[in-house]
Amino acid sequence: MRKIRYLFACSVICALLCSCAVQSRVPSTDSQVSETQSYSENHWETIQAKLSDVISGADTFFSRDFEKILTIDDYCSTYGMDDTVKITKYAVIDLDQDDAPEIVLGITENDQSDCGFLVLRYENGGVVGYDFTYHQMIDLKKDGTFGYLYGVADTGYARLNFTDDSWEYIKICNVTETSDTVTFFCNGQEVSKEAYWEAVAEQDSKEEVEWLAY
């Protein structure tokens, strides 16, 4: 009987030791989440710092539209030619949902209201800039969506997708019009007029982006 009790006690102790050993090899989920969040935050901050160097004038960027390297002052001179062009405001925002920031700069000509925007983003180790007219990026929202207007041919709401050296719209809802037809779309699918206006109302209700004085 003593021998049986002894063997049973030994087996229990071994089981406990094995259990502890297995548990010690299981990584902490909390630790993994913390490390991922830390990496994401550092990634965002690093890119934002590079973009901020450009808007402060401490560094340059490559203009896709002018196809040359410019400072912000150079850009305003090149953009305006005979007009007085100024950057009046900016917003830090993730336009294409890639977990990295872009900076959108608001442009005025001759002290008039917004005439367009310059979008700065980090690509392949450097900062590049894309020009947008006012009608290409109307009423920018905090989630990166906005309205656009190409006359009666095509108008609606979208977000941006950046390609190798350009950009394109990912259309959320839009309406196209010809001489005899008006067609409504949501996410690329034809829908009823009522469904379209419901999507428009949802977009209009979104919080606007926070603009900071430049």
Task: Outline where the language-model segments fall.
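Positively charged n-region of N-terminal signal peptides that target proteins for export
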Residues: 1-6, 11
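Blade-edge motifs of beta-propeller repeat domains
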Residues: 32-84, 125-136
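Beta-propeller blade termini
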Residues: 86-95, 136-145
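Acidic/hydrophobic-patterned starts of short beta strands in beta-sheet-rich repeat architectures
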Residues: 97-107, 143-147
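Extracellular C-terminal loop/segment signatures of secreted glycoproteins
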Residues: 115-140, 167
